[in-house]
């Protein structure tokens, strides 16, 4: 059975070019980049090249790129550094719809005495910027807002938010894990202090990430150890993955405009056809300010987990929320924050496409999903009691 993979916000296929770039550094050029000998020096030069490739994708300088193990580490390092470099400040400003990497950390820090404000979002998953500005206080050490939501694809105006934070002398961090490689980002044109990237969301391997730290920003290391990453992140470098991430960044920079236009057309076709063919369905979140690859659709009176299981019988892979929380039976915290009705939130499915998806795959999903929803609604007591007459809000 062929797999149709529409869960790319959870993880993505490693590009063939990325794998080819990595392979020599497992068994041939396996030296430690910190070694004095020329064998290690070859590896160090290749890491410098990867750092340049990553910096070019986001309009940064190579010195501003710190390689980490993942987006979660980058988020933790950024927020903890901001608190460590501003010990007199005890307030953190974030949103209710952040990824668990930020949300769970903030909950942990609140138990340690920090005051955390989680800004609400509207029905489209967007922030009220007036409320954001009012929430900035002299005690605020750091603002952490995602650039793009992993469940709905909604884009936050982080560049404007960073300016407002800077006006009050507050550090600004953004979790850009879902945004990098999908939309243009130029750190030279904004004042964001720190930005998180995860390799496996842009066709690099798992276990590698980046923390961008703007030149001049005070930084307190999260992992203490050796001198690696200019003493900003201890630990022997994950050379093959760093090189793979560099190559993935180069590919993303080259292909972004053309491929994302194609991916958006496929996403829009999937969305339009499903809404037309399946009654009592709706898109969750803004349809204007969002990633080109993501749609989150609710099918009322059915369980998202049941939809996923039946789609899986046809080889269709999607998600009922963040891959870091989808093991829970509770509705998505993102959709709850948006005020999505319970009967809709429980039946939400996130489809997230990549450059490797084809129109034939999208047509197959459009063909199969309506009958899956019809079958499940036939088993739903709410649907059978006549609630199907309800109008989707």
Residue ranges of model-derived segments:
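Pyridoxal 5′-phosphate
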Residues: 1-393
């Amino acid at each position: 059975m062929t797999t149709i993979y529409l869960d790319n916000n959870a993880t993505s296929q490693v590009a063939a070019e990325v794998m080819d770039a990595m392979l020599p550094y497992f068994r041939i050029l396996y030296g430690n980049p910190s070694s004095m000998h020329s064998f290690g020096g070859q590896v160090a030069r290749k890491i410098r090249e990867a750092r340049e490739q990553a910096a070019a994708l986001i309009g940064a300088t190579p010195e501003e790129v710190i390689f980490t193990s993942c987006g979660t580490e980058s988020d933790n390092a950024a927020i903890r550094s901001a608190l460590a470099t501003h010990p007199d400040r005890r307030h953190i400003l974030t949103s209710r719809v952040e990824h668990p990497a930020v949300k769970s950390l903030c909950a942990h820090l609140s138990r340690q005495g920090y005051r955390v404000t989680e800004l609400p979002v509207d029905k489209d998953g967007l922030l009220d910027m007036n409320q954001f500005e009012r929430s900035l206080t002299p005690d605020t050490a750091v603002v952490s807002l995602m650039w793009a939501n992993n469940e709905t694809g909604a884009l936050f105006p982080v560049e404007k938010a960073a300016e407002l934070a800077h006006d009050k002398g507050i550090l600004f961090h953004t979790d850009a894990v879902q945004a990098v490689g999908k939309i243009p980002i130029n750190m030279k044109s904004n004042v964001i202090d720190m930005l998180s990237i995860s390799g496996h969301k842009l066709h690099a391997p798992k276990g590698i990430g980046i923390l961008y730290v703007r030149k001049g920003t005070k930084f307190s290391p999260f992992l203490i150890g050796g001198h690696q990453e200019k003493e900003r992140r201890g630990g022997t470098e994950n050379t093959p993955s760093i090189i793979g991430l560099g190559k993935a960044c180069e590919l993303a920079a080259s292909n972004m405009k053309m491929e994302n236009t194609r991916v958006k057309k496929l996403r829009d076709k999937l969305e339009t056809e499903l809404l037309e063919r399946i009654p009592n369905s709706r898109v969750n979140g803004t349809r204007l300010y969002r990633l080109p690859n993501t749609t989150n659709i609710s099918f009322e009176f059915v369980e998202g987990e049941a939809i996923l299981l039946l789609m899986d019988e046809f080889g269709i892979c999607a998600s009922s929320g963040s891959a870091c929380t989808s093991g829970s039976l509770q509705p998505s915290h993102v959709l709850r924050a948006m005020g999505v009705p319970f009967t809709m939130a429980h039946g939400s499915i996130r489809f997230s496409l990549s450059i490797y998806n084809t129109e034939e795959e999208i047509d197959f999903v459009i063909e199969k999903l309506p009958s899956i929803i019809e079958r499940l609604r036939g088993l739903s007591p709410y649907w059978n009691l006549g609630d199907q007459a309800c109008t989707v809000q």
